[in-house]
């Protein structure tokens, strides 16, 4: 079997052992090269992070300029002011304003009647008379 494989592959059998995980020649400088590669990757990542931080700072300066120009507040500032206003109103007050009832909360009865009427339309005449009484 080995003979057939050697004949079929020719001179590539020497490299075949290396491909299959056999004896690999160790490069004496491989460890040093790997350290240099990792150091270069780390430096590239630091540079990228620095550029990104600088870019974000420039964007924030531009955003703040637009906010100042048009009198727009940041979302966090709006929320903080709203919370402070709510606390100021509610502190020590027994008569604080109640939460507003959303529209449509008391309209459930009308909806139920309309659903019942809709169902009654599809029933035969004698059954409609029974349910109407």
UniProtKB/Swiss-Prot annotation:
<dbReference type="GO" id="GO:0043195">
    <property type="term" value="C:terminal bouton"/>
</dbReference>
<dbReference type="GO" id="GO:0046928">
    <property type="term" value="P:regulation of neurotransmitter secretion"/>
</dbReference>
<keyword id="KW-0532">Neurotransmitter transport</keyword>
<dbReference type="GO" id="GO:0031201">
    <property type="term" value="C:SNARE complex"/>
</dbReference>
<dbReference type="Pfam" id="PF05835">
    <property type="entry name" value="Synaphin"/>
</dbReference>
<dbReference type="GO" id="GO:0005829">
    <property type="term" value="C:cytosol"/>
</dbReference>
<dbReference type="InterPro" id="IPR008849">
    <property type="entry name" value="Synaphin"/>
</dbReference>
<keyword id="KW-0813">Transport</keyword>
<keyword id="KW-0268">Exocytosis</keyword>
<dbReference type="GO" id="GO:0016079">
    <property type="term" value="P:synaptic vesicle exocytosis"/>
</dbReference>
<comment type="function">
    <text>Positively regulates a late step in synaptic vesicle exocytosis.</text>
</comment>
<feature type="region of interest" description="Disordered">
    <location>
        <begin position="1"/>
        <end position="40"/>
    </location>
</feature>
<feature type="coiled-coil region">
    <location>
        <begin position="28"/>
        <end position="60"/>
    </location>
</feature>
<keyword id="KW-0963">Cytoplasm</keyword>
<feature type="compositionally biased region" description="Basic and acidic residues">
    <location>
        <begin position="15"/>
        <end position="40"/>
    </location>
</feature>
<comment type="subunit">
    <text>Binds to the SNARE core complex containing SNAP25, VAMP2 and syntaxin-1.</text>
</comment>
<protein>
    <recommendedName>
        <fullName>Complexin-1</fullName>
    </recommendedName>
</protein>
<dbReference type="GO" id="GO:0019905">
    <property type="term" value="F:syntaxin binding"/>
</dbReference>
<feature type="region of interest" description="Disordered">
    <location>
        <begin position="85"/>
        <end position="112"/>
    </location>
</feature>
<comment type="similarity">
    <text>Belongs to the complexin/synaphin family.</text>
</comment>
<keyword id="KW-0175">Coiled coil</keyword>
